[in-house]
Regions:
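A short catalytic or substrate-binding loop motif that flags glycine-/basic-rich loops and adjacent residues
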Residues: 81-83, 124-128
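Active-site beta-strand-loop-beta-strand hairpin of nuclease catalytic cores
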Residues: 135-145
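Non-catalytic C-terminal interaction segments of nucleic acid-processing enzymes
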Residues: 211, 215-324
Length: 324
């Protein structure tokens, strides 16, 4: 679009706004808005009891979550939004402050994390993989990558998933094939595209997503200006840790939690148990090793465990809402 065309659009927007004498509100890119973004975030801050001293961090984190390539702005208004949950849990770390940190037992040790990035983009094939949260340790040596799950395993348990042909060669390598076979997930060899088949309905997308995130950890961040701080953190870190973080609904569903427990064990059986073999296959496939130590957690982290290890971390209304 040329500058002349941009100016024409700008003139139309000004005409609309002036017709009802709306105040002038601009986005970061200079486009005219009907409402200040803070009006929208204020509703979330009020509903979940975000204190005024955390307003700046919440607003900035909200923007990072909702303006990502995942189009989370269309999803965050759901009561069971998978975008909202990590935002409410980790937003305080988006703008680092002295004395603000959480403690987690990951990678075989207890680490303090003082910085959070949302929707970080790493190179995979074509489109990047977007990891929900990346937590940076206080010493900058470790980044913990978290893929948040709330109800996805209920919505997308299936016996078959099809993906593009560009992934086929990677998945045909013995390290990944044996990992999938551990849960009787087969690859349709005669197909051009990658087709995963399972005897029983399972959350196959969660496994494919984890493997894509691991590719991204090996290949590194997508080089864009809006990720400069994350890129600096990635380059500085010596160790990268990956795990899903799940919301455990068993206190709500009691005995009817098969999908949750199935995915918890699915991740452990495929990714957790065979993590090193999967990483070796990825490094061979991309013909690259970034020199960083990549650690894959054996079992998923849960929001319940995070809360137990950090009992005073969450805002009270957030704890009540999610039963944490």
């Amino acid at each position: 679009m040329t500058n002349t065309q941009k100016n024409k659009i700008k003139k139309i927007a000004e005409h609309f706004r002036n017709s009802l004498k709306f105040p002038k509100v601009l986005s970061k890119s200079g486009a005219e808005l009907l409402f200040d973004n803070d009006l929208f975030t204020a509703l979330f801050r009020e509903r979940f009891g975000v204190y005024s001293e955390n307003k700046e961090a919440f607003n900035a984190a909200f923007q990072a979550v909702t303006e990502g390539v995942g189009q989370e702005i269309t999803k965050i208004n759901s009561v069971v939004s998978s975008a909202l949950l990590p935002l409410l849990v980790f937003y305080k770390l988006y703008i680092p402050k002295e004395g603000i940190s959480i403690i987690l037992k990951v990678g075989g040790e207890t680490k303090k994390f003082t910085r959070a990035f949302f929707e970080v983009r790493n190179k995979v094939i074509g489109r990047p993989s977007c990891v929900d949260v990346a937590l940076v340790s206080s010493d900058g040596n470790t980044i913990l990558f978290l893929e948040s799950k709330l109800t996805e395993m209920f919505e997308d348990a299936t016996t078959e998933k099809e993906y593009g042909s560009s992934y086929k060669d990677l998945y045909m390598q013995s390290g990944i094939r044996s990992a999938l076979n551990n849960r009787r997930i087969a690859i349709v060899e005669e197909a051009t595209n990658l087709i995963l088949k399972s005897e029983q309905p399972q959350y196959l997308e969660g496994i494919k997503q984890s493997i894509s995130h691991l590719i991204g950890l090996v290949k590194g961040p997508q080089d864009t200006q809006d990720q400069s701080e994350y890129i600096n953190a990635y380059n500085h870190a010596e160790r990268l840790i990956y795990t899903p973080i799940l919301y455990d609904p068993t206190h709500i569903l009691s005995k009817h939690d098969n999908e949750y427990s199935n995915y918890h064990s699915l991740y452990s059986d495929v990714i957790g148990t065979h993590g090193n073999a999967i990483l070796d296959a990825i490094k061979k496939w991309v013909k690259k090793s970034n020199g960083k130590k990549i650690v894959i957690e054996q079992s998923p982290l849960t929001y319940q465990k995070l809360t137990q290890e950090n009992p005073d971390w969450l805002d009270e209304r957030v704890k009540t809402f999610y039963g944490l």
